[in-house]
Curated annotation (Swiss-Prot):
It catalyses: dCTP + H2O + H(+) = dUTP + NH4(+). It is an enzyme of class 3 (hydrolase). InterPro entries: dCTP_deaminase, dUTPase-like_sf, dUTPase_trimeric. GO terms for biological process: dUMP biosynthetic process; dUTP biosynthetic process; nucleobase-containing small molecule interconversion. Keywords: Hydrolase, Nucleotide metabolism, Nucleotide-binding. Its EC number is 3.5.4.13. CDD domains: trimeric_dUTPase (cd07557). Catalyzes the deamination of dCTP to dUTP. Coiled coil: none annotated. This is dCTP deaminase. The keyword Nucleotide-binding applies. The active site is at residue 137. Pathway: Pyrimidine metabolism; dUMP biosynthesis; dUMP from dCTP (dUTP route): step 1/2.
Length: 188
């Protein structure tokens, strides 16, 4: 597998709709305002977080069960910022909608700006022929509230191209998160 460059990412986004909306350069500021960078980088794409958040709460004293997840465990927030309570987490989604080629696996890594503040981003790999908005999980590992900014960079996608296509893709399997839009909770 080889990692793909900015030229390949740009071509796949523009000719095949791999990333929509697509920002073909790295944005570090908007006017006089500084932002956490997003858009194409040398060997990746820095995604933005949309303004839809689900913040974990324990007001119902529920047990977290991935096979029977209770939606009431979250408070929905639509805002330019999200405050995550200490030692808690929030879900969000990317602004970008992805269409992953059949011979590509995409890995997501958190941005150092957030990591250096104790905020960890977790996303499982985007499998061959998966498409949708990426659901992002932000863990606040600190003892203080932590802030996430909507419409700014939160993570980087790395695209790894295989030397041969897989026999069965995510789409072929009928993956349960295929075509997801918005913030998507656990499914079984």
């Amino acid at each position: 597998m080889s990692i793909k460059s900015d030229k390949w990412i740009r071509r796949m986004a523009q000719e095949h709709g791999m990333i929509e909306p697509f920002v073909e350069r790295q944005v570090r500021g908007e006017g006089a305002d500084r932002v956490i960078s997003f858009g194409v980088s040398s060997y990746g794409y820095d995604v933005r977080c949309a303004d839809e958040f689900k913040v974990f709460t324990n007001i119902n004293s529920a047990t977290v069960d991935p096979k029977n997840f209770d939606e009431k465990s979250f408070v929905d927030i639509k805002s330019d910022v999200c405050i995550i309570p200490p030692n808690s987490f929030a879900l969000a989604r990317t602004v970008e909608y992805f269409r992953i080629p059949r011979n590509v696996l995409t890995i997501c890594l958190g941005k150092s700006t957030y990591a250096r503040c104790g905020i960890i981003v977790n996303v499982t790999p985007l499998e061959p022929e998966w498409e949708g908005h990426v659901t992002l999980e932000f863990s606040n590992t600190t003892t203080l509230p932590a802030k996430i900014y909507a419409n700014e960079g939160v993570a980087q996608m790395l695209f790894l191209e295989s030397d041969e296509e897989c026999e069965v893709s995510y789409k072929d399997r009928g993956g349960k998160y295929q075509g997801q839009r918005g913030v998507t909770l656990p499914r079984t």
